[in-house]
Amino acid sequence: MADGFSLNDALSGSGHPPNQGWPGPWGNQPAGPGGYPGAAYPGAYPGHAPGAYPGQAPPGPYPGPGAHGAYPGQPGGPGAYPSPGQPSGAGAYPGASPYSASAGPLPVPYDLPLPGGVMPRMLITIVGTVKPNANRLALDFKRGNDVAFHFNPRFNENNRRVIVCNTKVDNNWGREERQTTFPFEIGKPFKIQVLVEPDHFKVAVNDAHLLQYNHRMRNLKEINKLGISGDIQLTSASHAMI
């Protein structure tokens, strides 16, 4: 199965010191006064840093003019992403077509448009907080009424916590894939990142790789909407190319 980078490579950067001017690798954020490390707004997950899968180093130089793959928000030249929370300017970052970021609180359920569908190296980031007495939450990558990728953490299924992944075509659900590793906590903030690869979705939660789900729908360009639902307070939803 093809893969743009191995999981070991993706997670190998966690011990490197942070680059100047941008938050360091996830999990190594210095604490900011009065808030979570790296939190840019109330409800942001600790160390919220869009634009990189956990531990992934930027593929290009840092961050010279027009450097391909430079971290978003760096003063490397025109067209770079703005810093988190700042408005975008003219000349979007090359390859970031499209980039969408909505800062909350957002209504739930919430639909995030994915114009042009999903594609390899697209990174979707969802930030929020699990509500007290939560039962479930769900991400649904949709093609019309079909669901290409259903990501469904369940907090109490027969007194167990489990994550269920599946695909729905013509109103018929396929074979469930279940994950017992459960990184979500009642009342706690979370960050979900979904990285699209040629053959699969990678999912990371709270800065750590969680699971991989092989594509069951092969035409990725038809997957043009992400539905977010469940017992959460939704702070932000965004997508970008990395």
Swiss-Prot record:
Compositionally biased, Low complexity: which spans? 17-31, 80-93
The subcellular location is:
Cytoplasm; Nucleus; Secreted
Entry keywords, A to Z: Acetylation, Cytoplasm, Differentiation, Disulfide bond, IgE-binding protein, Immunity, Innate immunity, Lectin, mRNA processing, mRNA splicing, Nucleus, Phosphoprotein, Repeat, Secreted, Spliceosome
Q: Which SUPFAM superfamilies match?
A: Concanavalin A-like lectins/glucanases (SSF49899)
Task: Detail which positions bind a beta-D-galactoside.
Answer: 173-181
Q: Name one GO biological process term.
A: positive chemotaxis
Q: List the Gene Ontology MF annotations in alphabetical order.
A: disaccharide binding; IgE binding; laminin binding
Entry annotated with the keyword Plastid: no
GO-annotated cellular components: cytoplasm; extracellular space; immunological synapse; spliceosomal complex
Q: Which residues carry this modification: Phosphoserine?
A: 6, 12
PANTHER family, from UniProt?
GALECTIN, GALECTIN-3
Q: What is this protein called?
A: Galectin-3
Protein source organism: Oryctolagus cuniculus
